[in-house]
Each structure stands twice: as C-alpha cells, then as structure tokens.
C-alpha cells in the first residue's frame, strides 16, 4: 500500500488497511506507509492506522524508534478515539520493547483517570 494524498477516498483507504491487517507478510515493509496515514484529516483512518501501527510495533519493534514520538503525540488529542488508539499502540510497542516507550511511561498513568471509559480501558 503506497499512500499519496488525495489518491484514495476514505472508504478505499479503510478497505486497504483492512486488507493489510490480514496480510502480515508485508507489515514490515508497510510501516512507513501506515505511519503516513496519521497525517490524514480522517479520524477513522487515523484511528485505524494507530491501531495497526500498534500491532506492527508488537511484531517489529526494531523498526519503530522513529515513529513512537508521533504516536505519543496523539495522547494529547481532544478526540477520545485517538487517545485510546495511541495508548493501545504504545502499549503494544512497549510489550515488545519497553525502552521505546520508556520516555512516555509516567505520562501514560494519567489515562487511568481519563474522562472516557474506552481510554481508561486501553490504559489497562
């Protein structure tokens, strides 16, 4: 999947991400493309990309050093779904390599008291 601005509609991108989710053989080579989707204006695409990056980071943590800070930036989102997905993604990456998320470790605990239940559950 090669993402280029305005090349795909939201539904096409979501469908592509769904197909990519099932094709783990190409995950490692697709990390950069999925990361690029974090810059879209679509909440749905950003959320799916964050989720998939978490899964990819669990499998390929060695490829995630340059992406973790951008994922962590979503922890400050006003959108609960993006906070939830970022928290989940960091948790997945951290399970594979704690050192990657160590700079954010203390900040993660504030989400135990988040106003949104889904965010609190992702903290666990």
Q: Positions of the model-derived regions?
A:
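A positional/architectural concept
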Residues: 27-35, 42-51
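Helix-adjacent hinge/juxtasegments
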Residues: 78-102
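Structural signature of alpha-solenoid helical repeat scaffolds
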Residues: 41, 59, 78, 96, ...
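Structural signature of alpha-helical solenoid repeat scaffolds
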Residues: 18, 54-55, 91-92
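Alpha-helix N-cap/helix-start positions at coil->helix boundaries
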Residues: 7-11, 28, 43-44, 80-81, ...
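N-terminal "cap/leader" segments of large eukaryotic alpha-helical scaffolds
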Residues: 1-36
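Alpha-solenoid HEAT/ARM repeat scaffold
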Residues: 10-17, 32, 47-50, 83-88, ...
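Amphipathic alpha-helical scaffolding segments comprising HEAT/armadillo-like alpha-solenoid repeats
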Residues: 25-37, 61-74, 98-111
């Amino acid at each position: 999947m090669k993402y280029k601005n305005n090349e795909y509609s939201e539904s096409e991108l979501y469908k592509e991400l769904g197909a990519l989710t099932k094709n783990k053989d190409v995950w490692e080579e697709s990390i950069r493309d999925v990361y690029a989707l974090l810059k879209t204006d679509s909440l749905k695409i950003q959320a799916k990309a964050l989720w998939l990056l978490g899964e990819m980071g669990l499998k390929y943590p060695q490829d995630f050093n340059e992406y973790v800070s951008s994922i962590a930036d979503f922890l400050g989102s006003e959108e609960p779904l993006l906070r939830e997905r970022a928290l989940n993604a960091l948790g997945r990456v951290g399970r594979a390599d704690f050192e990657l998320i160590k700079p954010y470790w203390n900040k993660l605990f504030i989400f135990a008291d988040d106003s949104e239940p889904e965010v609190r559950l992702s903290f666990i």
